[in-house]
Amino acid sequence: MQHLFEKLFRAESMSQEESQQLFAAIVRGELEPSQLAAVLISMKVRGETPAEIAGAAQALLADAQHFPRPDYLFADIVGTGGDGTNSINISTASAFVAASCGVKVAKHGNRSVSSRSGSSDLLAAFGIRLDMSAEQSRLALDDLGVCFLFAPQYHTGFRHAMPVRQQLKTRTLFNVLGPLINPARPPLALIGVYSPELVLPIAQTLKVLGYQRAAVVHGGGMDEVAIHAPTQVAELNNGSIESYQLTPEDFGLNRYPLAALQGGMPEENRDILARLLQGKGETAHAAAVAANVALLLKLYGQENLRHNAQQALEMIHSGQAFDRVTALAARG
């Protein structure tokens, strides 16, 4: 391990295999806190490479609790969090709407990073159990088209890094790993990142990890497809990556100010999204979810974003998406 430390302290990049070896030791709790802090900061200052990020993700996936991976096509829709906008839980709502549109979503998530309510906080407020077994979650995915995988339940090795991360009080590689370590290992993913500089590197990382099709997005300060500003996209499709920009108009949607998407505490967000998913919500909220669902559906081969957004809006207005929330809660 010492040779890897010395390599990092010379500001040299690790290979994918070296990164996997190092992070396997981290999740086993084999590094001293001072060593872990030095590793994370040296990588941060130099800038983590896609190979290093992929190696770290592979180490955490190898250490994760097993999930019975389905053989049908399914996706994740998830953000890094930490964008500081304190918005409503767009990706969580989008998962239920996408399932209503007929696709399968295994959403990986955690407690809040920067907002007052992360996806897990919101689901708990809806009465959805965070500690469902992997088998129960797989059945929900089969039957309802949506399940939620609570990161700490599958990634116990994360706890070894937590004290150091809390003391450092700065973003490190761990802040981008969450969306890359879904234990169900989906072949498709829509991933939001907190910084535009991460869009292409994370898409390159998804290529290394073997994703079939994926889109990495950052929109006007948000780790989502935005309806207040252009969204930067890097789309991976069978090994090739295309970078482009999307505007709300590309989805046939109106623009709304970022302030229209302000969220609150988990109970407030629950009430906002309950109204939305029952077809009684704010038009800005519906548009934000429709844009994200539309891009997710594109990953399934539905290439027309305007048509996809319209399909999502119809599902939102029908109230069918909320039926999946109550059905998932009833499985507790």
Swiss-Prot record:
Any GO molecular function: anthranilate phosphoribosyltransferase activity
An example Gene Ontology biological process: L-tryptophan biosynthetic process
Q: Where does anthranilate 2 bind?
A: R165
Q: Which residues bind Mg(2+) 1?
A: S91, E224
Which residues does the record give as anthranilate 1 binding sites?
Answer: G79, N110
* Pathway info: Amino-acid biosynthesis; L-tryptophan biosynthesis; L-tryptophan from chorismate: step 2/5
Reactions that this protein is recorded to catalyse: N-(5-phospho-beta-D-ribosyl)anthranilate + diphosphate = 5-phospho-alpha-D-ribose 1-diphosphate + anthranilate
Q: Which family does this protein fall into?
A: Belongs to the anthranilate phosphoribosyltransferase family.
**What's the protein here called?**
Anthranilate phosphoribosyltransferase
Q: Which species is listed as the source?
A: Yersinia pestis (strain Pestoides F)
